[in-house]
Amino acid sequence: MLSVDRFTVVLDACSLFPMVVRDVLLTFADHEFYAPKWSTRIHEEWTRNLATRFADKSAANDAAPKIAAIRSAMDRTFPDALVTQVLPESSEIVDVDEKDRHVVMTAVAARADAIVTFNLKDFAAEQLELSLRIEVKHPDVFIRDLIDLNEKRALAAFRDLRARKRRPPWSVDELLERLIRAGLVQTSAWLSSADVLPLL
């Protein structure tokens, strides 16, 4: 079992933007698989992108307070997650895409072990691991790694996630479909396995 005092992960904005990915990642953090970290800028990016998605919909006026409530709940649930003193850029990250360097520096400030992001190509993964000892992981790979640590606790986390989805409730099939659509294919495959699915 990982110690949350040692295993710290920065969640990039793109991993917090899709609802089901955010919910799974935060549920696993709540079940103490790892310690999540983010910055004000990361918060601003995912909330802005989510607001843009609702901009052309009739629910746009209702979206802003809901998004703000989610952000507030995240900071309240994980009071140590917000990294307030992000370090200035260093020469060790020149190969990282300019728009993502703040994520790396958040990880450095947080002494994080990993960054979870869908934008793997924008991070110089080998360089970060060699020079800063920070891994860059796709959310699906990261979640599967957590599952492999303790499958029983992972199943409990997914059961907890489903139990909180009441308006409307999520069926097992809907959860699996949402995971696949969000790019969590390996995670969905594990949940769909013959020995796990009946317990979900």
Regions found by a protein language model. Give the residues of each.
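Active-site neighborhoods of divalent-metal-dependent phosphate/nucleic-acid chemistry enzymes
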Residues: P79-A114, K165-P169, E177-L200
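Acidic, PIN/NYN-like endoribonuclease modules and their adjacent C-terminal/linker elements
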Residues: K121-L200
